[in-house]
């Protein structure tokens, strides 16, 4: 007996889109993407008690209708008392400080705010067109910078709105206890603005796909997409 699985076809992921453009993705597009991703993560947490644990540009999908979706739940996990208790894989480049170096080594738990950090790193990368730790050659260098240096921010000189800069700054609050959860993010001015603002993501997406070439796939993955195992 044959078994057929019908799956929705999406156009591409934000990672490949960035490579196609070879530069920043406009704030208005990222605004709509951010609204969709925060709502998706909030839904996972509230309705299913699940933390994604691998938020990054390659797991954010877009299509010609302008729809944005979150994918790859291979390492997502159940929350127990709102905490992740299980060991999981993830990408070092997008990993929150509290996952790298738990405040209490005897209780290396973390919550959905770890995904908020990952979202912040992803937004910096997509908004600037450059991975914030691109000069690092190893995962260890990335982890060291995450722990020892100030979080990356959106460069004011690139003309980002104050709301966008503030949103990313909130997501990349180093102390996870002060980092907002999804309910607070949904109240942020940046989210409120792009919930209602009319943005033609579909036309922008189709234009980009029509005038750019598909990025070549090499034999290996960039260093910040290598799996890194931790709690």
Which residue stretches match the model-derived regions?
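A conserved short helix/loop substructure at the end of the activation segment
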Residues: 172-184
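Conserved short submotifs of the Hanks-type protein kinase catalytic core
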Residues: 1-13
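Activation segment signature within eukaryotic-like protein kinase domains
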Residues: 33-34
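Conserved activation segment of eukaryotic-like protein kinases, specifically the C-terminal portion
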Residues: 86-99
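Regulatory extensions flanking the kinase catalytic core
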Residues: 181-216
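Catalytic-loop of the protein kinase fold
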Residues: 45-62
């Amino acid at each position: 007996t044959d078994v057929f699985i019908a799956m929705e076809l999406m156009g591409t992921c934000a990672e490949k889109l960035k490579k196609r453009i070879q530069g920043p993705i406009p704030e208005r597009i990222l605004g709509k993407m951010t609204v969709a991703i925060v709502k998706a993560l909030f839904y996972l947490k509230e309705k299913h008690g699940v933390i994604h644990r691998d938020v990054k540009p390659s797991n954010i999908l877009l299509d010609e209708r302008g729809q944005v979706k979150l994918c790859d739940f291979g390492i997502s996990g159940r929350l127990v008392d709102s905490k992740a208790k299980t060991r999981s894989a993830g990408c070092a480049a997008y990993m929150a400080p509290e996952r790298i170096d738990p405040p209490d080594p005897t209780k290396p738990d973390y919550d959905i705010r770890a995904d908020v950090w990952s979202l912040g790193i992803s937004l910096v990368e997509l908004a600037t067109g450059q991975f914030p730790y691109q000069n690092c050659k190893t995962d260890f260098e990335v982890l060291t910078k995450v722990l020892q240096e100030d979080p990356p921010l959106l460069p004011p000189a690139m003309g980002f709105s104050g709301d966008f800069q503030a949103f990313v700054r909130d997501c990349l609050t180093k102390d996870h206890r002060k980092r907002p959860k999804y309910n607070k993010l949904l109240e942020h001015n940046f989210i409120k603005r792009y919930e209602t603002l009319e943005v033609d993501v579909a036309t922008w997406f189709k234009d980009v796909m029509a005038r750019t070439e598909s990025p070549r796939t090499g034999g290996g993955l960039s260093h910040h997409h290598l799996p890194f195992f931790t709690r």
